[in-house]
């Protein structure tokens, strides 16, 4: 998928993020968050993006997520079947202070036009000490059950300078060789992003990441001639409105 396709995806998010009106005497809001990132390495440089939009009130929301990673050659990076270009639509509801439960559907496009769709459900919110957690369980049309965890923490170094360590991990119930996904722990990534908030809504950043494929996933990735372990420098932009 080429750059023009990513532009279309971004346009769809902007179209979703239209001002809302009050319903049933409860204020309705919308928000759009985005991140665009260049991932630099001598082996597998790539461009990654992540965007989310929601509309709703304090207790219920409709959420749309889109993320993806594309290598410098223009091909979708499967990341061992853990990424591709992924779109998710959720209905979420507040279940506790700072915690939402959510359920919905997903559709992911991998390199070569291979696609996977399925049902997804999970929780998202703030754990103790302000750690942001997004945990999602999915079942694809091929019967693979997967669990994904994203966690991050904002450490305020000054009013404008924030360090954000983060963790990504995914496990799968069985092999899906068509997308290079193996059973067990498929992949984890540890990283640090250091951003400078020019305004609250606009923050460039730099960072570093360590990515490791494991188990059967590492075998599929190696068989495709791709590295199973990567250290990358990160340069990106975080924004919201």
What are these regions (language model features)?
Residues 28-33, 130-132, 136-241:
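Outer-membrane beta-barrel transmembrane domain signature
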Residues 88-164:
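Gram-negative (and chloroplast) outer-membrane scaffold detector with strong preference
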Residues 1-9:
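Bacterial N-terminal signal peptides that target proteins for export
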Residues 35, 50-54, 88-92, 122-124, ...:
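Outer-membrane beta-barrel architecture
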Residues 17-19:
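N-terminal signal peptide c-region/cleavage motif recognized by signal peptidases
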Residues 2, 21-73, 89, 233:
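Outer-membrane beta-barrel initiation region
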């Amino acid at each position: 998928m080429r750059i023009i396709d990513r532009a279309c995806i971004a346009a769809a998010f902007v179209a979703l993020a239209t001002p809302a009106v009050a319903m049933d005497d409860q204020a309705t809001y919308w928000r759009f968050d985005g991140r665009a990132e260049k991932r630099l390495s001598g082996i597998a440089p790539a461009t990654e993006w992540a965007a989310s939009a929601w509309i709703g009130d304090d207790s219920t929301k409709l959420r749309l997520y889109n993320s993806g990673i594309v290598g410098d050659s223009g091909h979708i990076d499967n990341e061992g079947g853990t990424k591709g270009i992924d779109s998710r639509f959720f209905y979420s509801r507040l279940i506790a202070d700072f915690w939402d439960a959510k359920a919905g559907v997903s559709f992911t496009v991998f390199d070569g036009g291979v696609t996977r769709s399925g049902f997804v459900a999970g929780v998202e919110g703030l754990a103790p000490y302000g750690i942001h957690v997004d945990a999602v369980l999915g079942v694809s049309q091929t019967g693979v059950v997967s669990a994904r965890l994203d966690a991050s923490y904002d450490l305020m170094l000054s009013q404008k300078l924030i360090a954000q360590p983060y963790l990504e991990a995914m496990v799968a119930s069985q092999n899906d060789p068509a997308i290079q996904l193996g059973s067990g722990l498929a992949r984890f990534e540890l990283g640090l992003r250091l951003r400078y908030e020019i305004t609250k809504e606009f923050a460039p950043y730099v960072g570093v990441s360590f990515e490791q494929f494991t188990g059967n996933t590492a075998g599929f990735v190696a068989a495709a001639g791709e590295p199973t372990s990567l250290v990358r420098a990160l340069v990106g932009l975080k924004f919201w409105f």
